[in-house]
Amino acid sequence: MSEFGAGSDERIHSYTPRTFDFTPEFQLDFNRRYINEMEKRPDYIGYSIWNLVDFQVDGRGDSKPNLNQKGMLTEDRRKKEIYYYCQARWSDIPMIHIAGADWTKRVEICDDSINVRKISVFSNQKTVELIHNGKSLGVREVVNGEAVFAVPFINGENLLDARSGALSDRLKIQMNRRQESRILMNLFPRQNPIRKQWKNRDRLPHFQVFSRRLH
């Protein structure tokens, strides 16, 4: 196969990535699926991921204008998560990496009872252990370069340590979790002539937005 790939922007993130949302999470999921399929098919003699490095394309209107973002490295040669994933699958040099190094400050609106998020550790070792704030989350088998852990995040600092033999990696994630707060807003300003047509002002249309209380 000549090429496949998906663009990503290290400033955008999602726990539920979707097509063309330009999150590193979608780029990883897209390429992971293609690589898994290619590895299953003996009739393919080779394939290539497009591209190694983000590059300029005048007139392109993605999340970063004039840039093709399908690279495994940013335009200034910083490694994306897909780079570490491919390294874990294909490199013989021992390595370990906790995914999410460009998503260390997270804000969420959620129920207090929901505090578990999945974290991937990329490695070419057989097993890895993940430690969260000093407590081991167990040892997982590495499958296709990746081990997935359910991490019980807390508000504030979350320190993650991944270990496999002499290899280790550390990632600090600052989490700000808040319950949703609703704000009702009128669509029409006070002096809008359309407003005069409504006899009962309490019936004015409104919409709901969900604000994030950062403090």
Q: Predicted regions span which residues?
A:
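Extended substrate-binding grooves/exosites of carbohydrate-active enzymes
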Residues: M1-E141, A150-F153, L159-G165
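A residue-level signal for beta-strand positions that form part of recognition/binding surfaces
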Residues: M95, R182, L204
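Beta-strand-rich structural segments
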Residues: R117-S123, D202-H215
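Residue-level signal for glycine
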Residues: G134, D169-L171, R213-H215
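Glycine-centered loop-to-beta-strand initiation motif
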Residues: G145-A147
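Terminal or standalone catalytic/regulatory effector modules within metabolic enzymes
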Residues: N158, Q174-R177, R190-P193
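Edge beta-strands of extracellular beta-sandwich domains
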Residues: A166-L187
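Compositionally biased low-complexity segments at domain edges in trafficked proteins
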Residues: N186-S211
